[in-house]
């Protein structure tokens, strides 16, 4: 992976790879076989929110989501992101840019989106392809948020409030009504 590709999933604050899981504090280098998600939200070219979370913590949080939300997310990603079609089209290319150049759900070019989020699954310094990496524009993120149950929104709000400096309602710059992207 070239340095430009790596930088998509490095911390915008430090310019370096994320070191720890935001939820449990595990060093992301401690277990080289444990994948982790990097999620970053941008307003224009400015990264306004970012985190890395290990697969254990990500899976545990997802299990807490209501059945209704889990089904809504699965339906959204199956119908709107068209995972199989995306996989067949992009899998042969092990380059990040084709995967994130446009919104995975509505095809809006990333360069034209007022806000967007990037998500990538990494194993050490290596990006894991299919279905990630992906880009979601702010409009599609808002649509996803509207599909979630109050229970799931509460779990996500608790995650944000626990791990970031201000409560979710105070994230004024975020495109999706005060909540960062749920990737």
Q: Residue spans of the language-model regions?
A:
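Short, intrinsically disordered terminal segments enriched in charged and Pro/Gly residues
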Residues: 1-13, 63-97, 146-183
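Short recognition patches in nucleic-acid-associated and regulatory proteins
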Residues: 15-48, 68, 97-130
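Generic hydrophobic, helix-prone segments enriched in Leu/Val/Ile
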Residues: 35-38, 61, 73, 77, ...
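Short metal-binding segments enriched for Cys and/or His
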Residues: 47-74, 129-156
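Long compositionally biased, domain-poor regions of proteins
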Residues: 52-56, 60, 101, 108, ...
């Amino acid at each position: 992976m070239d340095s430009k590709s790596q930088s998509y999933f490095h911390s915008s604050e430090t310019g370096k790879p994320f070191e720890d899981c935001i939820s449990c504090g595990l060093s992301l280098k401690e277990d080289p076989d444990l994948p982790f998600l990097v999620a970053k939200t941008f307003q224009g070219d400015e990264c306004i929110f970012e985190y890395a979370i290990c697969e254990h913590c990500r899976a545990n949080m997802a299990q807490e989501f209501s059945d209704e939300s889990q089904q809504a997310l699965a339906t959204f990603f199956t119908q709107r992101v068209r995972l199989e079609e995306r996989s067949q089209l992009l899998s042969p290319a092990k380059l990040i840019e084709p995967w994130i150049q446009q919104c995975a759900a509505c095809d809006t070019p990333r360069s034209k989106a007022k806000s967007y989020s990037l998500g990538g699954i990494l194993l050490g310094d290596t990006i894991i392809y299919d279905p990630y990496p992906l880009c979601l524009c702010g409009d599609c993120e808002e649509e996803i948020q509207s599909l979630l149950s109050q229970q799931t929104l509460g779990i996500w709000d608790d995650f944000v409030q626990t791990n970031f400096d201000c409560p979710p309602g105070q994230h004024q710059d975020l495109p999706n009504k005060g909540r960062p992207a749920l990737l």
